[in-house]
Amino acid sequence: MTLYQIKPLFQSLLRPTMFWLYKHHVTANHITLAALALSLLTGLLLMLAAQPILFLLLPIVLFIRMALNALDGMLARECNQQTRLGAILNETGDVISDIALYLPFLFLPESNASLVILMLFCTILTEFCGLLAQTINGVRSYAGPFGKSDRALIFGLWGLAVAIYPQWMQWNNLLWSIASILLLWTAINRCRSVLLMSAEI
């Protein structure tokens, strides 16, 4: 069970916004680039300032990014805006945004740089394995337990927690370690889904 499974409900809430954007000639690629720009600017601010209180921004930005990601996909599918450029922007934008938003954790007190870098590597690996499924079987794998939406929830809550209770940063490295394990588990599950689907075919 992952947050990805409640995506249809989230999309239904966003559908009026999607129609408004379409009416005003906003394209899926515009939304994708806006999400990327927001992530890069937020990540840069968090890294340069390196103040725990600013991590209050993280859950807000992650929620906005999640909404923008849903909107760009809806515009592409439902408004006939699917393009090869859009697919490239979507996949690369997701990975770059993840790095931009989670790399600032490295600059928090009590954070072990190697653990944060390992976590980011596992994040990229997880997305690569999801894409690998699409390359082999034609269907992208969103297997959990620690997909993009789940990461946004957990890291957003942690950003909120350390902003309000800075003393909780003593647990940073435990969270990065657990996250890395869950990400590796997710990568394995996504590879397994490729093999299982291939066996069925």
Swiss-Prot record:
UniProt key word ATP-binding: no
GO terms, molecular function: phosphotransferase activity, for other substituted phosphate groups
GO biological process terms held by the UniProt record: phospholipid biosynthetic process
Main location, first listed in the record: membrane
Periplasmic compartment residues: 1-43, 108-116, 173-175
Topology of this chain in the membrane: Multi-pass membrane protein
Protein name: Inner membrane protein YnbA
